[in-house]
Amino acid sequence: MLEPIAYDIGRLCKEEDKELTPKLIDIDVIGLSQEKIFYGIMTPFRCPNSKSIYELRKSYVKADGIKMPFDTFRELTSIFKKSFIGTVKYKGNVFKYQILNFGKHVDLIELEDADLYIIADGRRLIERKELQIIPKIREKISPNSAIYSPAVFPWEIPLLAYIGVDYFDDSLAKLYASMGYKFTKNRAVKVDSFSFEELYNNNKKVYEEILEEVRIAIKNGFLRNVVEETAVSHPYLWANYRRYEPDLRNIPLSKENKIIVTTNINIPEVKKYLERLDNYEPYSNIIVLLPCSSKKPYSISQSHQKFIKAIKSAKVVVEEVILTSPYGLVPRALERLVNYDIPVTGEWSFEEIELINNCLKNFLKKVKEKFDDYIVIAHLPEHYLEILELDDIVITSKGNPTSEEALKNLTDTLKKYKELTKSKDINKKGQRIHNIQQLAEFQFGINFIPNEIFINHKGQIFTKINNKNQQIASINPKNGLLILTLSGGELLWNSGGKDINYIEVNYEIKKGSLFPPGFVDCNENISYNDEVVLIKDDTFLGIGRALMSGFEMKKAKHGALVNIRNVKS
């Protein structure tokens, strides 16, 4: 029914005629219009009582069986029909739908193999913790199947799209217009100076505008911010937003567009980063702690240019570590992977202090495991120093890290500890190779980069294979990740086998797209937009980019799974 084309926790899909979802549904389910679905299968339902609405309810209840009231006692659920199955013709195709009618007893749901799932009690679920059944449904069904949640308010759409809903309706536009309410992006406002038609047209327009914004947000990677903007005005939405634990495979490892950090510190992109940060191995036993900067990557900011120059003047190889919220700790080697904006007040929350100190303690534990002796130099402003829970540190910042006095102090201090690195085989060339290897470890879960490599000014990485210099990867200037070449993909496959991002196929592939008929298996931990290798009978064939997570690929029935970039001849 749908073909996913972009993910940002929520998903952007296209129908067969190229129309994009999330959108207002225009499918005539069981011969009922949107209005009839609202007043029919949605009943009993809390909405304003009036004779006209009662008559609509009574006349539209035509589904085969009695709908289970939301708060039905569990002992009485057996007398109600919990699922309605049928088919519907849409744009020349016949689709199977399932109306899910389980009341508050979400554990009773039994999913059929369908193209469209209709949440009969969505209006009640959205105000309760049971709303989390929707992502659980999404987890079990094909990515080509759609979820429809009837009778939602416009400001509920971003959250519902975020957790996996594809179709909505604007049935509440007419109902609330008839009661004198004007919809805005965030609420319904009682007004007296508008006619029913004016209110109705306005309310319908708000639905369309919200849906358009959601589609744009998914495509450009800022859906979470749209969700927060609308959810924060409604406690029930905010509660369900905070409850939801999204599948991190449905976001890319690094985004080209800036992540906007608001009040919610537990954002998916940060969680994904922190999970992989644990695998980072430090290179030097001289650790220099630095503050973050508003400009990203940090190294192009004026302040970090000064820090880098001061460190270079000391002619000492150090491990530069940036302390920041919400990422906690960012080694210089990984700085291009974090691109964010956060409001700076000069004050830290308890959660931020705890995160930074935990990250730092874990990092220093690894330093100690690798090197018996090490030193931590804090070149930080006062409001950073106040939160550090470290005993043995050398402070060089003298109040203002960018002042000439502080920068000279940093250089002189580093010179004093130069002897620490002499017996450790630490040098600048080795650090550059180490940084690429740690990037590979972070991105692929394995270091497949040889110790003998050459990196040119374009970020292209070469090594000798069969006595020939061959490019194995390049650094993507937009997101800081590695882009594989054929040689690099084969090296990755030979290094990690099926522990890495592999896609198994059943035919001799060509450049283009991989579709489900040619798909055999994959690593289900592949994330959307990941670099992948393609194999057949354990033989390397080519490289590409994942268009959905590996978990979703295994359930897909149609649509492109992988963009095949290059194939071994």
Curated annotation (Swiss-Prot):
Thermal behavior of activity: Optimum temperature is around 40 degrees Celsius. Activity decreases significantly at temperatures above 45 degrees Celsius.
SMART domains, per the entry: PUA
GO BP, one annotated term: tRNA modification
EC number: 2.6.1.97
Class of this enzyme: transferase
InterPro entries recorded: Archaeosine_synthase_1, ArchSynthase1/Queuine_TRR, DUF5591, PUA, PUA-like_sf, PUA_sf, TGT-like_sf, Uncharacterised_CHP00451
Domain spans labelled PUA: 495-569
One Gene Ontology cellular component: cytoplasm
Catalytic activity from the UniProt record: 7-cyano-7-carbaguanosine(15) in tRNA + L-glutamine + H2O = archaeosine(15) in tRNA + L-glutamate
Pathway membership, UniProt: tRNA modification; archaeosine-tRNA biosynthesis
One Pfam family cited in the UniProt record for this chain: PUA
The entry's keywords: Transferase, tRNA processing
UniProt superkingdom: Archaea
GO MF entries: archaeosine synthase activity; RNA binding
Stated family: Belongs to the archaeosine synthase type 1 family.
Function as written in the Swiss-Prot or TrEMBL entry: Is responsible for the final step in the biosynthesis of archaeosine, a modified nucleoside present in the dihydrouridine loop (D-loop) of archaeal tRNA. Catalyzes the conversion of 7-cyano-7-deazaguanine (preQ0)-modified tRNA to archaeosine-tRNA, transforming a nitrile group to a formamidine group. Can use either glutamine, asparagine or ammonium as amino donor.
Quaternary organization: Homodimer.
Protein name as annotated: Archaeosine synthase
Species name: Methanocaldococcus jannaschii (strain ATCC 43067 / DSM 2661 / JAL-1 / JCM 10045 / NBRC 100440)
